[in-house]
């Protein structure tokens, strides 16, 4: 299955608690940290919820 690389580019400070929890659930910590996840509907939904904080590219 395809994979995507998710990079945290903006800080979740001052964002809604749901968005901050989504950042943590994806495994992102500090700015510019990246994770590689499977490209499925659940991950895409999480990324869509915080699309203004992250960049996504094919891994």
From Swiss-Prot:
Keywords: Ribonucleoprotein, Ribosomal protein. GO terms for biological process: translation. InterPro entries: Ribo_uL30_ferredoxin-like_sf, Ribosomal_uL30_bac-type, Ribosomal_uL30_CS, Ribosomal_uL30_ferredoxin-like. PROSITE patterns: RIBOSOMAL_L30. One of its GO terms (molecular function) is structural constituent of ribosome. Pfam families: Ribosomal_L30. One of its GO terms (cellular component) is cytosolic large ribosomal subunit. Part of the 50S ribosomal subunit. NCBIfam families: rpmD_bact. Belongs to the universal ribosomal protein uL30 family. This is Large ribosomal subunit protein uL30. It comes from Streptococcus agalactiae serotype V (strain ATCC BAA-611 / 2603 V/R).
